[in-house]
């Protein structure tokens, strides 16, 4: 087991992960931001170096003091050989199976290993799988072979403009975290609000302010570089505001050179249509999250 800490080693790791896109996307996005100052103070662990098979990105041990906070206790995993990484992932030095935690990966094949480890460590595993998209600009740069007409869903829909007298673009403030948390699918609790506050404070965000001077539609970015937690207040839905937020967010982050990707729930047809309008590229792999609760 090796810890990857220096900027030089992180760059080598990022370059290696790029060769395995899109399956390595979740870890690639995280390592990109680790090498841009590592604002979430994460660490990379590999089974061997430099010719690694499996890499795990996780918080520092001293930052994992709350055994019940799976938003903080998050592990990002990529393995070149997902069927034979169980011993490495089972090590307590790699993953603390005594805590509530979540594992995210662009590899569904890790599911069997995680289920086995869940049984070994006596706990419950809940799996959520979603569609995975890469923003077209990012896909053209990182995975040009996937940017092909046969992979794209062509949409002729055009969103209606919004009233710029009533609605204004802005950046979210930490004080808006409770509002975001109130309608986030994975949120709605005190620990998720702390995570949202940290994302708003650390990374660029976009919102549309409504007539009352509060956000009515928004989108954030998390510590893995994923575009997440987008939402619109029920009162303002069906006005295509989320499209304008997403479009503005992509162009803002594109100027910063960030790789951009996102997941969409398999039943969320509205955001799937929006992704088609925006030209997001659907990936052949999926977004996966496993929530683990020890008994």
Swiss-Prot record:
Keyword Glycosyltransferase: no
MF terms in GO: gamma-tubulin binding; glycine N-acyltransferase activity; N-acyltransferase activity
Domain of life of the native organism: Eukaryota
Range of residues in the leader sequence: none
Pfam families, alphabetized: Gly_acyl_tr_C, Gly_acyl_tr_N
EC number: 2.3.1.13
Tissues where this protein is expressed: Specifically expressed in kidney and liver. Up-regulated in the regenerating liver as well as in hepatocellular carcinoma.
Residues modified as N6-acetyllysine: 41, 43, 48, 80, 83, 124, 128, 140, 150, 255
Gene Ontology CC annotations of this record: centrosome; microtubule; mitochondrion
Subunit structure: Binds to microtubules.
Annotated function: Acyltransferase which transfers the acyl group to the N-terminus of glycine. Can conjugate a multitude of substrates to form a variety of N-acylglycines.
Protein family (similarity comment): Belongs to the glycine N-acyltransferase family.
PANTHER family given in the database record: GLYCINE N-ACYLTRANSFERASE-LIKE PROTEIN KEG1, L-COA N-ACYLTRANSFERASE-RELATED
Name recorded for this polypeptide: Glycine N-acyltransferase-like protein Keg1
Naturally occurring in which organism (per UniProt): Rattus norvegicus
Gene that this sequence comes from: Keg1
